[in-house]
Structures are given as C-alpha cells and as structure tokens.
C-alpha cells in the first residue's frame, strides 16, 4: 500500500515550524486502502500496553494498541462503564513506533473512577473497521470477552511471581515416626487404620479402607525437606492439602479446625514450619497456603458427632444441640445435606449474613480463617475446597448466597492481611468469582491449563480418557480461557499438571518422560502460577484416587534425575525474567502438521520467544521474532541449552527436539 502522512492542522504545522530544531515524531498514517492488517494488531494488559493494570479508583488508565506502521487511519477505545451502564468512546492518538520501525503504537486514556469497566478497540482504515478485545481481532463488534478494568482489585504480587509446590502431607516425608498412625490405632465408622511401608501400594489390604491407609508423612517431614523445595527446585510457595484433625488420610473430613492432626504433629509444629518457610536461611522467602475445607465438616466433628465421641451433644444427636442449625436436616437425624451425597461429609449451613457459621469460619476475631492468618501462625493464604458449593439451607452453591459468602470472606481475610491469597477450587470457568474483584484472587485452573495441556500433549483428558486436540485448537482454548479473567487473575491462576483429584500427568503420557519435559517447559513459561504436585517434577505416575497420592520417592529427588534438573533450570529462568510472569503473551506459530506451538512473552525490558515441539521427532522452526520487535542482527539465547542465534530477516531458525522446547531470550 502507498503510505501517506496524515494532513496536519494549521496549529500543528505552526508548532512544527517553531520547533524545527527538535525531533518531532510524525505518525505514519495510512493511505485509505480500506484494509486493517490483523497480523499487526496487538494489545493486552502487559507493561507495554497498560500503565495501570491494577489501578486505584483515582488512577486513570492509559492504554496502547499496536498496529503495523502506517496501516490505520484512526482507532478508538470503546468501554462500558458500570457506573452508568453505558458505552463511552475515547479517540486514540498516535504515540510512537517500535524500535524496529515495524509497528505504530496508538494510545488513549480512560479517566479514573471507582467503577468497573470493560473495553475493546475499534480500528479503522478508511471504510474498513476491525475490532480487538480479549479474544483477539474480529471483523464484527464482539459482545463478550472484553478487557477488564477493576479499580482497587489487587492480587498478591508474590502469588503472580512465585512457583507453587503442592504437598499431600501423609505421602511426602516422615520426619517424626513417633506420631505415625499404626495399624489399628483407631477405627472410623467401624474400619481400623492401616499403616503401610513407605513406597508400598496405596491401596488398602482386605478388611481396611483406602482412606484409612497411612504412610507417616507429617509437617516435620515437610520442614526437613524445605531445602529440596526452596533450594534444589526453587519453588517458594507451599500449598498443603488439609492438615487439621480428621480421621482419614486426606483430612477433608475435618474434626477440629483449630488443631493440627496428631499424625502430622501439633500446632507448635505448624508454627515452626511456617517460620522456616518464611525464612531465607534455607532458600528464598517462602509462603504457605492452607486448604480451607469450609463447605462441610466430617461427621465426627463435635458439631455433628455422629458416633457419640464427645460429651457434648452434636447436631446428629440432638435437635437441641447448640450446633443443630450449623447443618441442614431434611429428616433428622439421618437425612441431611452433604457434600455430593457423601454422608460422612455433612454440609455446613451458612444461613444469613451474621450467622454463627459465618462467624466461626471467617467473621469472628477467633474464626478459623483469621486465627491462622494472624500470629503466631501468619499463613499467607487459603485455598478454598469445594468453593462453589458453599451455601445456606442445604443449597448447592453457585448462587447469590454463595457469592455473598465469598465476598464477606474476602473482606474478613483482606482485613487481616491485604496481601493474603484467596484461591477457589473450581473446575470450570471461575469468572463469576473473580471478575468483580470482590471474591477470589484466582482459582484452580483445570479448565484453562490442566485440561488443554493434557489433551494436547498426552492425547488424554485429566482423568485419562482419550481426548486429543490440535495445536490450533490448543491455542484457541488457551486464548478463550484467558479472556475469561482479569489479567491479574490470569497471572495468579493455579496451573498444575496433576493434583490429588486427577490422574498423574506421567501416567496420562504413558510414562514418556519427554512429554513431561515439554509440559514443564510450557508450565514455567505460560501465564499463571506454576504449581507442581509433589513428584510431578520427577515423573511420578499414578492413576485415579488414591493412586495419585503415592509416597514420594526420595531417590529421584536430585538433579541427577533429568526432569528434576529441568524443573530447577526452568524455575531459575522464570525467576530471572519478569516477562515470563507478568509480561504480555502473544501467539507466534500454530503448526498443526508439525505440532509446533510458539509464543512470545515480553515486557518493556525483555523479549522471549518460546518454541514447543509436540511431535516425536525434531523439527527446524523459523520463529517470527519480528512480531516481538527483535531487531535484525541481534542475538537471542536459548536459556535451556545456552545456544545463541542471530535474528535474520525478522526470523530466528532453531532446531527443537521432539517433545521438547526452546526459550529464546534477549
């Protein structure tokens, strides 16, 4: 196309004449060829494009849109303001070129106010118009997936910038054999406990129950292995499955929220562990997230007391119990609301605002949530189990009351520590709990990470059923699920390959360690908080529950294990480059034939091109790094191999092994 300058007004021309001795940036506006080049369009809320990704109510937000140099004649920001439930327009002005002279940047400012806003861009070239929002460019105006502006909503920086390590305590390390549950130590619902040797099968022997099989892992064991987690691997956030007193090995059937289970130690053991996690003597400063099982208790909790274990009368024993209204009975005593129909998990009744249950769980100064956030514990956040189901009167959640509860919970938690993390367990689109900035900071990213990664790399879904997607479908899935969330939520999502509820990634990949390598490279370079389920870093296998909770093989926990070594290197790389944590994300290649996926992570300091090869054979890939404004003649270095490459004609050519990747940084 022929490129012409925009006609200048007389006032601008006079300024130009009077300022001839100074450089004057001139917009390279397009001739009217009526064609917006989509391949040049880009915006997200990374540092290059948004000056205030977490604005206060008094901060205006200046946004930038990238286009090809000289390609468009005008651009506008169109935003919906919830203050007046109306659309508003902001004309954009040309701002600058990129360092390579390939792109223009246009900017516009949305004025400060406390209201939530949603914005998209209208881009014009003569009579041609394109639109751009969280789902990318389109020829027609979108009606969903706009970018978010949520004043005064901040997610913890340590969560965005950290790497998480999830531990199922009974199976990690036995640091104190004196507290081990032995075979026959107690019975629960008529079944005795069973003690197993470390490394043996997780399945119960005849006469026992899988949930009552114990291996001896405890908090002292976690404390003794902090050097492995924080130094060897480099992870700095620990998330523990439930640790409070409960009869089973998984502890999702709480008997006492205020006491650490004796099999794991005691409350002083927890204090010591937290102090050591926070310490920098054994690695980077760490953070601890506890599992809050607040939808239900166990049936052995004294509030319920189904087995008459306590002198006080629980709700199951008496309708005059002080805790009777903590639960919902349909026909007392045997018909009551429970979690997914499991009678061993009676569902808490949160009632109306100000209810006793709301008080004891989060509102009171001595509530469960506040007690552990305050000294002497000072935990750093809560992961909320079965969070969608929390409700009143036996209702099953995902309703107005559920959202009210989590809004109150947020106020209570942030009132103690504004930097505490709140992560809800949800298996689908958690937008209803995150898009208003008043409930969760983030969610478990089954839908936006675990499932698409599994289907693309292993050809199985996270429950090990056959399910395969192409590279293009993978990219589309990722883009669509990112668009569900505000950017600071995207950056805080819990991104895991496996967890305690699904089959192990290594089992889904048929034990092919190269597929674990590929998944790790993606996990550590994608948007969100990488979350390693203990053992995934060395390729631990395991089927459905309880097989996904095997005891940790400490002979593998060394850099001599190639997957552990790669995990260590990738975490080091992620920690080195903020662009991998809070930078922009741009798709570069989706090659379905060769199964190549490439994307850029970049900010105002670094530009990184990640290349993933999901094929079983090596491929030579031409990476269009011109999209990242990498200049010709400049050098990029693969941070995994150390090999360097020169940018030629806007491209970098790199050979990538099958089921492996490259992280090309400059």
From Swiss-Prot:
Note describing how the cofactor binds: Binds 3 Ca(2+) ions per subunit.
Binding-site residues, substrate: 296, 383, 500-501, 545, 549
Binding site for Ca(2+) 2: 174, 176, 179-180, 216, 218
Keyword entries, A-Z: Calcium, Carbohydrate metabolism, Chloride, Glycosidase, Hydrolase, Metal-binding, Secreted, Signal
UniProt KW Thylakoid keyword: no
Region forming the signal peptide: 1-29
GO biological process: carbohydrate metabolic process
Cofactor section: Ca(2+)
E.C. no: 3.2.1.135
GO molecular function per UniProt: metal ion binding; neopullulanase activity
UniProt-annotated catalytic positions: 385 (nucleophile), 425 (proton donor)
Family per record: Belongs to the glycosyl hydrolase 13 family.
Protein name as it appears in the record: Neopullulanase 1
Organism for this UniProt entry: Thermoactinomyces vulgaris
Lineage: Bacteria, Bacillati, Bacillota, Bacilli, Bacillales
């Amino acid at each position: 196309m022929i490129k012409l300058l925009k006609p200048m007004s007389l006032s601008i021309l006079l300024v130009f004449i009077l300022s001839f001795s100074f450089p004057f940036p001139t917009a390279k506006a397009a001739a009217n060829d009526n064609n917006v080049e989509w391949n040049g369009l880009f915006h997200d809320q990374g540092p290059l494009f948004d000056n205030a990704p977490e604005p206060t109510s008094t901060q205006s937000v200046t946004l930038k849109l990238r286009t090809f140099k000289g390609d468009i004649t005008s651009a506008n920001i169109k935003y919906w303001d919830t203050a007046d439930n109306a659309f508003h327009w902001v004309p954009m002005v040309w701002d600058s070129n990129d360092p390579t002279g390939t792109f223009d940047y246009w900017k516009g400012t949305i004025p400060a106010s406390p209201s939530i806003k949603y914005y998209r861009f209208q881009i014009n070239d003569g009579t041609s118009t394109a639109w751009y929002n969280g789902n990318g460019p389109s020829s027609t105006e979108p009606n969903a997936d706009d970018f978010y502006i949520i004043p005064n909503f901040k997610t913890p920086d340590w969560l965005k910038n950290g790497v998480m390590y999830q531990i199922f305590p009974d199976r990690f390390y036995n640091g104190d054999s004196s507290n081990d549950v032995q075979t026959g130590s107690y019975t629960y619902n008529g079944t005795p406990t069973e003690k197993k040797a470390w490394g043996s099968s997780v399945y119960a022997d005849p006469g026992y129950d899988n949930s009552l099989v114990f291996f001896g892992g405890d908090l002292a064991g976690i404390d003794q292995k902090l050097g492995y987690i924080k130094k060897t691997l480099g992870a700095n956030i620990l998330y523990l499955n439930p640790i409070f007193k409960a009869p089973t090995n998984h502890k999702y059937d709480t008997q006492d929220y205020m006491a650490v289970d004796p099999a794991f130690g005691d409350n002083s053991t927890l204090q010591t562990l937290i102090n050591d996690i926070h310490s920098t003597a054994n690695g980077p400063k760490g953070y601890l997230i506890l599992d809050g099982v607040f939808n239900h208790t166990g049936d052995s909790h004294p509030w319920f007391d189904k087995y008459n274990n306590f002198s006080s009368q629980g709700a199951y024993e008496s309708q005059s119990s002080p805790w009777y209204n903590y639960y919902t009975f349909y026909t007392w005593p045997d018909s009551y609301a429970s979690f997914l129909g499991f009678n061993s998990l009676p569902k808490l009744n949160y009632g109306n605002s100000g209810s006793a249950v709301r008080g004891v769980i989060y509102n009171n100064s001595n509530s469960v949530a506040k007690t552990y956030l305050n000294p002497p514990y000072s935990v750093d956040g809560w992961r909320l189990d079965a969070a969608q189901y929390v409700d009143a009167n036996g209702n099953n959640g995902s309703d107005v009351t559920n959202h009210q509860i989590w809004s109150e919970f947020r106020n209570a938690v942030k009132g103690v520590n504004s930097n505490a993390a709140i992560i809800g367990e949800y298996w689908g689109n958690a937008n209803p709990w995150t898009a208003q900035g008043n409930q969760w900071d983030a969610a478990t990213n089954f839908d936006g990470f675990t499932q698409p990664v599994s289907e693309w790399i292993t050809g199985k879904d996270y429950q090990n059923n056959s399910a395969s997607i192409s590279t293009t479908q993978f990219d589309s899935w990722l883009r669509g699920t990112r668009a569900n969330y505000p950017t600071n939520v995207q950056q805080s999502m819990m991104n895991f390959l496996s967890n305690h509820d699904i089959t192990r990634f290594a089992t889904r990949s048929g034990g092919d360690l190269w597929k674990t390598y590929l998944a790790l490279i993606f996990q550590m370079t994608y948007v969100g908080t990488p979350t390693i389920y203990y053992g995934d870093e060395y390729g631990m296998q395991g089927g459905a529950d309880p097989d996904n909770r095997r005891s940790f093989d400490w002979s593998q926990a060394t850099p001599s294990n190639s997957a552990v070594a790669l995990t260590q290197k990738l975490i080091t790389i992620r920690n080195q480059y903020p662009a991998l944590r809070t930078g922009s994300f741009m798709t570069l290649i989706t090659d379905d034939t060769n199964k190549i996926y490439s994307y850029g992570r970049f900010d105002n300091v670094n530009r990184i091109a990640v290349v993933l090869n999901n094929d079983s054979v090596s491929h030579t890939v031409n990476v269009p790094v011109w999209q990242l404004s990498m200049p010709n003649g400049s050098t990029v270095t693969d941070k995994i191999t150390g090999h360097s490459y020169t940018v030629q004609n806007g491209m970098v050519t790199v050979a990538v092994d099958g089921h492996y990747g490259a992280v090309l940084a400059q």
